[in-house]
């Protein structure tokens, strides 16, 4: 047995081998050490002919999935080695084979997977400075392929699909991409595969064979090179791990990565699209607000929509038309939602059916779902919007399959497939006969006994049974002259003879073998039904996608109606004009409609950048996020929380909101912030929407102000970037840029002062804030009065008047200089800001500054010295 184990393990060295022994899956050697540690199970030992006992541990077969999922969730590959012959009939060692390999991206356990999101596996091939990318979810049949020209866009695709597993060629693995960051921050397991997986000819042939086509033109892949290699390598990997023909992968969809709005991981987190930033929960996210879907398929599709907003105006309008019609047709919509409610996850059910793992209850769940389709289609037939008409056409009621399952499968079958009671009475004559034999055998024997007495005239004829002869007819010697010729003698006794007849033999076979035959026949018929359903996988998948899309549009329509959303107008002119916009999540979290609505106006001309000032806690971040979310919702195809909204299409949304130290990579808060800013400035376009909060706060005031100022100038210049931007800052000096840079406008959060206290009005108004109210916010936060009072004294001594004046002077100077035809390079813009902090040529002040013993000064001594030197300079200037 151990020899067999070692031979199997040699073939799957990168896997933990679950080796079936009776009622347990056993692990040995290093696998046992790893499994016992990760699963927290007892480690024992086994004699295997070596000097030391082999480490061993095991898990019961009936609970294997929970242990399996725990290992897979930690990034391990697990090979399942099953007994493939009956131990009772085996000669020698029972034959065993690996029947599947489970990895994070190939887990088929629907109980362990989140039904509201896809479980993607991605294959990346790096060849000649291009990336071939393919993505599949084998639980739903999704299969996509594209080609990408640079690493930034590749990261966008990784963020968009959020795969649980990436397989790649060695060139990508060694390309310098931050693979550790993907593993740690995104939770992705990454494997580099052997070179033969990526052989061009092998990959191409795999795809042609699987999809049964003769050329790639029929697949839409004629112009794809490294994309085809990626898709072929992924298919080969899936075939090897699943050990089946992957018949639910019926289509491969090529796509252009530029079809959707790009959202990097920072933006997805900061906008809390699908989960909250802190708790990592759905409640409190945008998806939580929008998701009123009734089916798992609909929930997954809505999540895709939220994570992949459209950038094509026609496609957006089609979605909005569908939502509009279902919003207007409220009665029909609620009827549809009522019929959608009992529909199970058709995509993952058909996966189980095609892979042969569906149990009888899965088929009854499938039938229950199909029974809902005719009334859904009936209601849809009067809809007029293009997408709803398309859904109606694609929604095949599958009445033939529904009828087959209803007639063949018991109403309430067991989960087990080989314990009978699966096939419905009346479906198969042989099943009915065996079932009667199992339950009515004694009655049949009594009837046969009575019939034989009447036919032969043998009054004392008896049917008896023993283990040697089975059932037999016993006739006493006094009546043996009446025994007919078709009786066959089996045994002679002193006073009687024992006989069998063909009919009795048939009854015996039926009675004694009825249960075994019944269970075997029921299983055979069940698999026939299952295979008949599996053969229609393409019809079922098409219907599943239609049902999912309908569920999404009905959900968005319901949310729009309940939450008083409006249909956004979509424009391609770069204008974002929102009246009385509201944050979709925050307004649902606070009571009694207390949310304060605000307007937003941005365009590509004179309103490109809004500089927003105001105290902490006043609502700046909420306002900026709300604008981004409204723009995103519109491009998803959803109605939006506003009185009116005219949304210009954005190709990307970037957010730079908050930061913390990245201890794992040794980066400070400021370094994290600057890295994010650099990413935005490199990858944003003039069609992007930027949400920037407190740029430059992680360093000294002067450095921070310089950087923030330079960033505003860079973004505002259409020759450099020219993106629409909401820019929140505590550097009130930046408000001087309004009027100096023609497309910069000031806004602030209105505040009402009551003595030393303040009230946040949450209203965005024109103009800049004259102070930050930091001391008042500190008071609201509960800072001790002693500290508050001292802070008031210090703030009166510190004046920023000179800084503000110098900002105005430099901005004016820059405005004049920019009239020259030469375009400044970005590093020149940086250098220009340094004039704000030019050294004052007062030798005595410089000398005193040089001689200060900074290391031994208290904070208050430092402040007093700064104040004294500042006054000295004021008097001279």
Protein language model features and the residues they cover:
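Charged catalytic and DNA/RNA-contacting regions of genome-maintenance
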Residues: 1-325, 341-354, 358-450, 796, ...
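ATPase nucleotide-binding head domains, primarily ABC-like/P-loop NTPase cores
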Residues: 29-32, 224, 294-295, 302-305, ...
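Active-site phosphate-binding and catalytic loops of NTP-dependent enzymes
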Residues: 81, 104-113, 245, 381-387, ...
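Conserved catalytic alpha/beta cores of large enzymes that bind or transform nucleotide phosphates
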Residues: 158, 163-171, 177-180, 192, ...
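Amphipathic heptad-repeat alpha-helical coiled-coil/stalk segments that mediate oligomerization
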Residues: 198-206, 213, 261-265, 273, ...
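Amphipathic alpha-helical coiled-coil segments
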Residues: 316, 323, 333-339, 366, ...
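Charged, surface-exposed helical/loop "interaction arms" that form contiguous linear patches used
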Residues: 355, 359, 369-372, 425-426, ...
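C-terminal tails and terminal domains of large nucleic-acid-associated
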Residues: 835-877
